[in-house]
A protein has these predicted regions:
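Aromatic- and glycine-enriched beta-alpha-beta binding-site module
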Residues: 169
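Surface-exposed acidic/polar loop and edge beta-strand patches at domain peripheries
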Residues: 1-152, 163-166, 175-185
Length: 185
């Protein structure tokens, strides 16, 4: 730090909390702020980006369903959010598969969550496995430098199983009002 601030939290921070009200009850959230961008990561749902704010202004679409911790049909729980990761068995509405897959509903195991003078850094793993079947580990790293306009998301998929596995992956980005409004270009 350069002497003008006594605590890094004056310019950047990471806070963890659990939602306690209504259908959001039980959602675990990482509330990250780099001084210019604020982003809420949903630890309960694949470390997806629930909401993104730029200089205090929301840029994410949130559906009328809002956020939910409950396991209910897709049409009743699709929340939108800035980033909704679809997969790994399916991304569409194929017969026998859930719309957009099940990955988004898998909880993340946070391996690291820290804020340093370089920036906000979160690392997590999401396991997708079954007895006598697939054993995939989805690793996500989220980084944003202090004072930056950018959010970097790096994903790696590791197959820890004995056989090759097919997978599909779709990044569903949901931009909303006020960024997406009449006259937007």
């Amino acid at each position: 730090m350069d002497g003008r601030i006594s605590n890094l939290m004056q310019v950047a921070s990471v806070r963890r909390y659990e939602m306690t009200e209504g259908k959001e009850r039980g959602l675990r959230v990482l509330d990250c702020d780099n001084g210019k961008l604020r982003f809420l990561l949903n630890e309960s749902k694949a470390l997806d980006v629930m909401q993104l704010y730029h200089e205090g202004q929301n840029v994410s679409f949130i559906s009328k369903n809002g956020f939910t911790a409950r396991e209910i049909p897709f049409a009743n729980r699709f929340e939108g959010g800035m980033l909704y990761t679809c997969g790994l068995e399916s991304v569409g509405a194929s017969e026998g598969y859930e719309l957009h897959g099940t990955h988004h509903n898998a909880p993340a195991r946070v391996m690291r969550a820290e804020c340093t003078k370089e920036g906000v850094s979160i690392e997590a793993e999401i396991a997708e496995s079954e007895l006598f079947g697939r054993n995939l580990i989805f690793k996500r790293r989220v980084f944003s430098a202090v004072g930056s306009d950018s959010l970097e998301i790096s994903d790696t998929l590791e197959n820890r199983g004995a056989c090759d596995e097919r997978y599909c992956l779709l990044y569903h980005v949901n931009v909303g009002y006020p960024l997406l409004d009449e006259g937007a270009k």
